[in-house]
UniProtKB/Swiss-Prot annotation:
The record marks H85, F130, F153, D173 as: Important for catalytic activity. The keyword Cell cycle does not apply. It comes from Shigella flexneri. One of its GO terms (cellular component) is extracellular region. The lineage of its organism: Bacteria, Pseudomonadati, Pseudomonadota, Gammaproteobacteria, Enterobacterales. GO terms for molecular function: ADP-riboxanase activity; toxin activity. NAD(+) binds at H85, Q86, S87, L91, I104, N114, F130, H148, F153, D173, E268. This is Arginine ADP-riboxanase OspC4.
């Protein structure tokens, strides 16, 4: 029953991706949207078909293989893979739970997002959980990498050593399939110190036969074969003899193999909807800043850092600046904020939000939360008719609401203004 449920959820995620992503339509790899609320398993069959298409495409490019190439391919196919998800959120206790952006939205969870409108429009893979991929037999050395596509996605690394029967692999970030220049790579010094030509060859788009928007996709069963064949294709084209010899070393170790693969590519693995497992490793890579903890709704880190009113001022300013209503309301309930506290917040020199903006501006800017605004005004923490002194000097909160066409805020301010006039 559990396996059937996983398969059904995966089918929904793939149906959404293949039917709604405009990129698949342009590549003639799309799938019609299901007629009912539930997706059939047809979308999983479609994934297998797409994977076979890309395997066939790369086989035609590299066939036949030399003995060195066959040996390298065999090493990759038999390698242990580890999957790394980085976040500033606290995603685990005894169980690791990682949810897709679509799942988070459906549950009205407020947290920092790494999925953007272009991703959703073009590939619609926002119902998947994303992982970097590492090749290593040495659990004690993990993680081997701390960034993905030059980006540090968080201070906590959550590592699993098991794949999903319904996952899919891309050789790069699925949306941004450009491999960056060597100077942006995490382990650049290894390649700059040891090789010459390949450091200039690595920056490129990784794509199929239909141009740079044609991003190869492999199901879990095919992913090692796809990685190996594409790596062989890159090695063949390289003019760097030293790099070629390094890759074809019969005794190459897993860490060196990982260095090669995550230099030539930036592997990304995707699991449908949600990962929930007790088989994982959590590694803290660095400290989490207060602002990052707030953006990630990491209450444990926030409570560790916000131990007095002075730090609460900082935290509240970060919450307002990042439109984190959940954290702002949490802090307001935990600490007894007064109008004097707000005045002290605005004088803080080490908080960019208070340096640039009045608190009233942050409360009423486009996308600000109505409940937070209501709390501040109803508890007398700010004056409804105060004119801004920093950004948009001379304007009021009503002006901000008018610019963003926030009818709920506009009505609230008008009622408050009317009440003020009646008392004069």
């Amino acid at each position: 029953m559990k396996n059937f449920l996983r398969k059904s959820i995966a089918a929904q995620s793939y149906s959404k991706m293949f039917s709604q992503g405009t990129s698949f339509k342009s590549l003639n790899l799309s799938l019609e949207a299901p007629s009912g609320a539930r997706s059939s398993f047809r979308s999983l069959e479609h994934l297998d078909k797409v994977s076979r298409h890309y395997i066939s495409e790369i086989i035609q490019k590299v066939h036949p293989l030399s003995s060195d190439e066959r040996h390298l391919l065999s090493i990759i196919i038999n390698s242990n893979f580890n999957f790394r998800h980085q976040s500033n959120s606290n995603l685990s206790n005894i169980i690791l739970n990682i949810k897709s952006f679509d799942k988070i939205q459906s549950e009205n969870i407020q947290t920092h997002k790494n999925t953007y409108s272009e991703d959703i429009k073009e590939i619609s893979n926002h119902d998947f959980v994303f992982f970097g991929v590492e090749i290593s037999n040495h659990q004690e050395k993990l993680p081997l990498n701390k960034t993905h596509h030059t980006v540090d996605f968080g201070a906590n690394a959550y590592i699993i050593d098991h794949d999903s029967p319904y996952g899919y692999m891309t050789l790069t970030d699925h949306f941004d399939n450009a491999i960056p220049p060597v100077f942006y790579h995490e382990h650049q010094s290894f390649f700059l110190d040891n090789f010459k030509e390949v450091v200039d060859e690595v920056s490129r788009y990784v794509h199929g036969n239909q141009g740079k928007t044609d991003v190869p996709i492999f199901n879990t069963k095919d992913m090692r074969l796809g990685i190996g064949l594409h790596l062989i294709d890159f090695i063949r084209k390289s003019k760097d003899q030293g790099f070629r010899e390094f890759c074809y070393n019969k005794n190459i170790d897993p860490v060196s193999l990982d260095r090669i693969i995550n230099f030539v590519f930036q592997l990304e693995y995707h699991i449908p909807r949600m990962l929930s497992t007790d088989n994982f490793k959590k590694i803290k890579l660095r400290d989490i800043s207060l602002e990052d903890a707030i953006k990630a709704s990491n209450y444990e880190e926030i409570n560790n850092k916000v131990t007095d009113k002075k730090m609460a001022h900082q935290a509240l300013a970060y919450s307002l600046g990042n439109k984190k209503a959940d954290i702002a309301l949490y802090l307001l309930s935990k600490f007894n904020f007064t109008k004097q506290d707000v005045a002290e917040m605005e004088k803080m020199k080490n908080n960019r939000y208070c340096n640039l903006y009045d608190v009233e501006y942050l409360l009423s800017k486009d996308g600000a939360n109505y409940k937070v605004l209501e709390y501040f005004i109803n508890n007398g923490l700010v004056d409804v008719n105060k004119k801004f002194q920093k950004a948009n000097s001379g304007d009021t909160m009503l002006d901000n609401a008018m610019k963003s066409k926030d009818s709920k805020m506009i009505d609230f301010f008008i009622k408050k203004w009317s009440g003020i006039r009646q008392t004069i």
